C-alpha cells in the first residue's frame, strides 16, 4: 500500500513538474524555402544596413532559396509606412516578418492580422510594447542595462562635480528609446548619481538635420548644459557635429549610442569622449535565424526553448522582464568606446 501511495505521489509530482521541464534544444535545419521580410524603422540608416548584412549572411548560411525582402518606409512616413509594409506582407503570405518597431502599439492590428494568417512575427531592436501580434523580441542588450550604461557614462564624463545634461532621442514612438531613457531615469535615483541633473528630453526623429538643430536648441535653452546624451546613432553624430561646428566641445560633451566608424573623429577631438553600442550585424543575423527557425517549425515561441544560431552559439527564449507580456531573446554584449579603442573598432 505504501509503495502504491509513493508511486502515485511520484506520478503526481511528475505531472506537476513536466510542463516546466527544460525543452530540448532545437535544431534549425538549412534548405527550406521561406519568404521573409526584414523591416527597419526606415531606410537610409547605417546600423539598419548592417543588420541587413547580418540577415543576408544568415540567409546564405541557411540556404534559403527565397530572396530576403529588405523593405522600409521613409523617415517622414515611418509609422504609417511600417503598418502598410506589414499589411502588404501579410497579403502576400510571407513566412516571417522581422520588425524594428517604430510605431509603438499602433502596429498591433497589422501584426495580429499577419499572425492570424500563420506568419511568424519577430521584432528586433525595438519591440511591440504590448507584445500583441508578436512571437518573440530579439533584444540587442538588456534595456535596464542600457539605462545604467548611459547613466554611468554621464557620471564618468561629468565627474564628481556633476552637472546638467539633456537627452536627444529618436522618436516619441520608439519603444526601445523610451525604455532606455526610462531605465536611465530609474538608475539616476541612486545616490551616486545625485549630482547629475536631467534637464530635458528632445527628439530628432533620427534625421540628421533635425537632430543637429535640436542639439543646438538644447544649448540655447539650458545655459548650464554640460552634456548631451543621445541614445541613437543618428542623434549622437549630429549632436557631436553641432558642438564641433559651434566650438562648444570644451564646454558641452556628447555621449550615447554610436558607431565607431562615425564617431572616431569626435572621440579623438574630445567632443564625444565615451559612447557605446553593440553589433547590428549580429542582431540581424540572430533575428534571421530566429524567424527562419520559427517559420520552419524548428523553434517554438515558448519560454525555455533553446536553439543554436550558427556562429553566434546557443540562445534561449525567456519571458521578457522589461514588458508585462512577451518573450525575449537576449543577444548582448555592450561594447564601450573611448580614445583607447575607438580607432581599432572603426576599421
Placement of each model-derived feature along the sequence:
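Hydrophobic alpha-helical segments within soluble ligand-binding/sensing domains
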Residues: 29-31, 82, 138-164, 210-212, ...
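Short, low-complexity disordered leader/linker segments with a strong preference
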Residues: 1-35, 91, 112-119, 343-347
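Flexible loop/hinge segments that line or gate small-molecule binding clefts
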Residues: 109-145, 156, 164, 260-268, ...
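Hinge/cleft segment of the Venus flytrap/periplasmic-binding protein
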Residues: 26-33, 172, 176, 288-347
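Hydrophobic alpha-helical
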Residues: 87-90, 96-116, 184, 200, ...
Amino acid at each position: 500500500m505504501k509503495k502504491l501511495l509513493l508511486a502515485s505521489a511520484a506520478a503526481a509530482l511528475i505531472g506537476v513538474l513536466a510542463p516546466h521541464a527544460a525543452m530540448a534544444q532545437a535544431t534549425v535545419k538549412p534548405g527550406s524555402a521561406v519568404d521573409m521580410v526584414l523591416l527597419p524603422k526606415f531606410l537610409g540608416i547605417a546600423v539598419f544596413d548592417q543588420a541587413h548584412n547580418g540577415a543576408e549572411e544568415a540567409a546564405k548560411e541557411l540556404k534559403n532559396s527565397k530572396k530576403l525582402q529588405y523593405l522600409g518606409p521613409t523617415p517622414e512616413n515611418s509609422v504609417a509606412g511600417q503598418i502598410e509594409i506589414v499589411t502588404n506582407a501579410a497579403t502576400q503570405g510571407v513566412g516571417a516578418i522581422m520588425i524594428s518597431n517604430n510605431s509603438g502599439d499602433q502596429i498591433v492590428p497589422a501584426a495580429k492580422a499577419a499572425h492570424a494568417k500563420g506568419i511568424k512575427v519577430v521584432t528586433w531592436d525595438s519591440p511591440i510594447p504590448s507584445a500583441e501580434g508578436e512571437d518573440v523580441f530579439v533584444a540587442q542588450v538588456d534595456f535596464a542595462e542600457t539605462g545604467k550604461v548611459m547613466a554611468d557614462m554621464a557620471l564618468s564624463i561629468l565627474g564628481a562635480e556633476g552637472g546638467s545634461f539633456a537627452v536627444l532621442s529618436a522618436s516619441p514612438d520608439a519603444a526601445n528609446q523610451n525604455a532606455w531613457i526610462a531605465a536611465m531615469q530609474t538608475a539616476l535615483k541612486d545616490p551616486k548619481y545625485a549630482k547629475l541633473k536631467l534637464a530635458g528630453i528632445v527628439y530628432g526623429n533620427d534625421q540628421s538635420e533635425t537632430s543637429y538643430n535640436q542639439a543646438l536648441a538644447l544649448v540655447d535653452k539650458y545655459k548650464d548644459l554640460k552634456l548631451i546624451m543621445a541614445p541613437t546613432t543618428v542623434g549622437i553624430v549630429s549632436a557631436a557635429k553641432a558642438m564641433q561646428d559651434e566650438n562648444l566641445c570644451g564646454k558641452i560633451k556628447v555621449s550615447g549610442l554610436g558607431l565607431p566608424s562615425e564617431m572616431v573623429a569626435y572621440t579623438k577631438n574630445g567632443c564625444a569622449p565615451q559612447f557605446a553600442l553593440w553589433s547590428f550585424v549580429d542582431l540581424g543575423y540572430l533575428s534571421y535565424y530566429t524567424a527562419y527557425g520559427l517559420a520552419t517549425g524548428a523553434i517554438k515561441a515558448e519560454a525555455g526553448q533553446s536553439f543554436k544560431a550558427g556562429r553566434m552559439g546557443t540562445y534561449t527564449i525567456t519571458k521578457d522582464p522589461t514588458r508585462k507580456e512577451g518573450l525575449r531573446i537576449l543577444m548582448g554584449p555592450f561594447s564601450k568606446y573611448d580614445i583607447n579603442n575607438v580607432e581599432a573598432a572603426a576599421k
